[in-house]
UniProtKB/Swiss-Prot annotation:
The gene is nuoN. This is NADH-quinone oxidoreductase subunit N. Keywords: Cell membrane, Membrane, NAD, Quinone, Translocase, Transmembrane, Transmembrane helix, Transport. It is a multi-pass membrane protein. NDH-1 is composed of 14 different subunits. Subunits NuoA, H, J, K, L, M, N constitute the membrane sector of the complex. GO terms for molecular function: NADH dehydrogenase (ubiquinone) activity; NADH:ubiquinone reductase (non-electrogenic) activity; quinone binding. PANTHER family: NADH DEHYDROGENASE. It catalyses: a quinone + NADH + 5 H(+)(in) = a quinol + NAD(+) + 4 H(+)(out).
């Protein structure tokens, strides 16, 4: 049943008003008085997050504008994720943003508009709606990546991201145009019904082009080459937001598109083969390329590439759901298990990664460096920062009893239950290999000689953000039930 009520768009409307309103405030306030942008943004995000949580549990599911936009718990879960990510980034940037004297007023509004674009991607029921959300998110990141006006690396990263991002968007848009040419519609449900059970060459080409476009956004190999340079050159807080929320938005759109593909068995089979190959090479190359890195932001870039490979394993479980009868598994159950694993892991990935980047931001601000060697003796210079970074990278490695272990358990068990044990084995082996380069950071922090390096003071909002990320990472590893139930509810909303 289609309905159009503005109340269903409340979260998106709030974010749009806040983003544009903060731009206006930044124009009105004199440059020396723009410190007030931080508390305004912080309280605005807290209020919006509270509403998004309420909407998730009590808002219900509906489609409106002829299915162009979906108000369901799947989208609601991602709205919470994007707001949590934005909130943690804002908490870690109060002092960092203060040094941007000329551009301080634009930082927070751009962050909110990027989050708005992500929400549009997560809720899109139409390929063009999804593309509009993607472009809103991407254009704001073009600006934010190049936000260091006097840093050549930041400017270079911004130009590279602009050129490569535009190319990937063009590929994605061409894939959408092929689908429109085949079906006469861009509305996902209509497209799914129009494609039928068989696929021709054009259908397969459209699928590959769409997956290539998504692959760029989530840093899948071989569409990952942009990530190391952009992660290294961008301001640390923007790298954090790009590595977490932007990646999650790409997965949200990919999952909705994959549900569309499953109606066409030929497309589903082609997509399954492609994703199996991409997942394997992404996990392997991402982890192996992290070993020689000397810059921590480049290392985290390759870590993020590997993490994308793990998450794709959950999407593979969704793909198998279209033909799992051969394994004696209920397709709906297989579908929900795969999506649940993806959603759970993305949320804990946000906390672990942003905890790590909160430390990276403060070390970069205090020392002016993001080289791993400059983390020597950090445990003595800033015990809290060292503890947060240690727990964050161990969670990313999947070490129990941290949340990352539970997340990988959900992802790998979803495909094991459906017979694809080999891809889970690759994921497990690569997770164990990743422990080496993660522990190399821990080793230099606790055993390295930090003599002559400055203190790394952590206080105020940044301290709270670090502690909160660390606590959530521990608690969700010991007691994952509440988040797992939310992920299950969100996944189930896609099959209602």
């Amino acid at each position: 049943m289609m309905s159009f009520e503005l109340s269903l768009l409340s979260t998106e409307i709030i974010m749009a008003v806040l983003g544009l309103g903060l731009f206006a405030v930044g124009l009105i306030l004199p440059r020396g008085s723009r410190q007030g942008m931080f508390p305004l943004t912080l309280f605005a995000l807290l209020g919006t997050l509270a509403y998004a949580v309420y909407d998730f549990f009590y808002g219900g599911n509906a489609a409106f504008l002829q299915g162009m936009y979906m108000h369901d718990q799947f989208a609601g879960f991602f709205k919470i994720l994007f707001l949590v990510a934005a909130l943690l980034v804002v908490l870690s940037t109060k002092n960092y943003v203060a040094k941007f004297q000329a551009y301080r007023g634009e930082f927070y509004p751009l962050l909110l508009l990027a989050a708005l674009g992500m929400m549009l991607m997560a809720g899109a029921g139409d390929l063009l709606t999804m593309y509009v959300g993607l472009e809103l998110m991407t254009i704001t990141f073009y600006i934010l990546v190049a936000y260091h006006p006097n840093d050549p690396k930041s400017s270079e990263a911004g130009i590279k991201y602009l050129v490569l991002g535009a190319a990937s968007s063009a590929v994605l848009l061409y894939g959408i145009s092929l689908i429109y040419g085949l079906t006469g519609s861009t509305q996902m449900f209509t497209v799914a019904m129009s494609l039928g059970a068989e696929a021709n060459t054009v259908t397969i080409l459209a699928t590959v082009m769409m997956l290539a476009g998504f692959g760029f956004k989530i840093s899948l190999v071989p569409f990952h080459m942009w990530a190391p340079d952009i992660y290294e050159g961008a301001p640390a807080p923007i790298t954090a937001f790009l590595a977490t929320a932007s990646k999650a938005a790409g997965f949200a759109a990919l999952v909705r598109f994959y549900v569309l593909m499953m109606y066409n068995h030929s497309m589903a089979e082609a997509g399954l083969i492609l994703l199996l190959v991409l997942a394997a090479i992404t996990m392997i190359i991402g982890n192996l390329m992290a070993f020689p890195q000397k810059n921590i932001q480049r290392l985290m870039a390759y870590s993020g590439i590997a993490q994308a490979g793990y998450i794709i394993v959950g999407v593979i479980a969704v793909s198998i759901a279209s033909s799992v009868s051969q394994w004696g598994v209920d397709p709906v159950s297989a579908f929900v298990d795969g999506i649940k694993g993806v959603l759970f892991y993305l949320m804990i990935y946000v906390f672990a990664n942003l905890g790590a980047f909160a430390v990276i931001t403060h070390v970069a601000q205090s020392q002016g460096s993001t080289e791993i060697k400059d983390y020597a003796g950090l445990a003595k210079r800033s015990p809290l920062a060292a503890a947060v970074l240690t727990l964050s990278v161990l969670s990313l490695a999947g070490i129990p009893p941290l949340a990352g272990f539970v997340g990988k358990f959900y992802l790998f068990s979803a495909v094991i239950n459906q017979g694809h044990v080999w891809i889970a084995v690759i994921g497990f082996v690569m997770s164990m290999i990743s422990v080496y380069y993660y522990l190399s950071i821990v080793k230099i922090m606790y055993l390295g000689d930090g003599e002559g390096l400055p203190e790394v003071p952590v206080h105020g909002a940044a301290k709270f953000g670090m502690i909160f990320s660390m606590i959530v990472t521990i608690v969700l590893g010991i007691y994952p039930t509440p988040l797992a139930q939310m992920a299950l509810t969100a996944a189930s909303s896609l099959v209602k």
